[in-house]
Amino acid sequence: MITNKVKTLILVNLGGPRTPSEIEVFLRDLFSDPFVFDLPLPEFLRLRLARFIAKKRAPKVQKSYESMGFGGGSPLVEETAKQAHALELALNERSSEQWNVKVAMACGYPNMRDIEFGKPNQDTVYLPLYPQFSRSTVLSTLAILETKFGECPVGSGGYVPHFGLDPNFHSISAKFIYEFFTNQLPKDQYLHYPEEKPNCDWRNLDLVFSAHGVPMRLIHKGDRYMEEVELSVKGIADELSKFGFNGGVHISYQSKVGPAKWTEPSTIQMISSLAKQGKHIAVYPISFVSDHLETLEEIGEQFKDLTWEMGGKSFVRIPALGIYPSFIQFLAEKVMHSDRKIQHCICREKGGESLQHCRFKD
């Protein structure tokens, strides 16, 4: 039975331009973030440089968005909204309280800095859709909320921590991959659903877990992102073995921007190497739970073309989890328990530093 009390869940994602007119704004927000674009420059110079880079990159990025067939924008906001709707239904089925689920983005619109998104507490809960902790995603989100409300939300009861190390997430992801290869997923629920399948037994192919890369300077600052990715992959691979999978398991990093050193090996390097050996290749987006430019265009088109060019025998893109029912129920369970048990600074533990207004700061 649902009571009159209404609780709000705010589903946070990185963001993406919904239309071509939002591309430069999205890029400006992205490169203005000190946890993403963290060059040792005075603030006014860093922001000026961020605006310059956004303006310069916008035309090139626009061509990539145009190629996806979503009106020149990214489907990420809409895909996140689908997850929000599914999660709202799941929460209201499980809870005696009424839940209203909103979508907010760290970059672009709807922007989580807007007034409609309230202070984190037990009645207003924030759930960032980042499986693994990184300074550039989770810590960035927490810093935005800290700037807005004057305190870090960790420990407030209104924040759901990253979930990529949870054994339940591993088993759900493994079953999702199994159901994809055995044609059990509803195709109409996934964008550009990959119709092609490897012309070999899926249990013997080479499975590449591709994560979004980050600059190595973040790792050197204490970001344990690579460790989290590796543990996520190990957990999923162990679960996949229960479905008979005994092929190759590989970790790589995609979406590098600029000349600085990033996490390696790159997915381009990994796929090139495997394809030259004549391998059957599948790519799973380990750090993404919503399909967008990096999964549909970069993995689905660019990496596929690279596989054929380098002599690979087959290539398949595995979709992101999206509204996979078990995943939505998993998130609902996380939301209902929130982070009331957290009694330490996860930012320092996972990202190398505490925020200024951390409630657990020594």
Curated annotation (Swiss-Prot):
One of the protein's GO biological processes: heme biosynthetic process
SUPFAM superfamilies listed in its UniProt record: Chelatase
GO (cellular component) term, any one: cytoplasm
Entry keyword annotation includes Cell cycle: no
Molecular functions (GO terms): ferrochelatase activity; metal ion binding
Coarse class of the protein's main subcellular location: cytoplasm
Enzyme Commission (EC) number: 4.98.1.1
CDD domains in UniProt: Ferrochelatase_C (cd00419), Ferrochelatase_N (cd03411)
Residue sites binding Fe cation per the record: 212, 294
Gene3D superfamilies from the UniProt entry: 3.40.50.1400
Catalysed transformations (reactions): heme b + 2 H(+) = protoporphyrin IX + Fe(2+)
Pathway membership: Porphyrin-containing compound metabolism; protoheme biosynthesis; protoheme from protoporphyrin-IX: step 1/1
Keyword terms, alphabetized: Cytoplasm, Heme biosynthesis, Iron, Lyase, Metal-binding, Porphyrin biosynthesis
Metal-binding keyword on record: yes
NCBIfam families documented for this protein: hemH (TIGR00109)
HAMAP family in the cross-refs: Ferrochelatase
The protein's role, per its UniProt record: Catalyzes the ferrous insertion into protoporphyrin IX.
Similarity remark: Belongs to the ferrochelatase family.
Protein name: Ferrochelatase
Source organism per UniProt: Leptospira biflexa serovar Patoc (strain Patoc 1 / ATCC 23582 / Paris)
Lineage summary: Bacteria, Pseudomonadati, Spirochaetota, Spirochaetia, Leptospirales
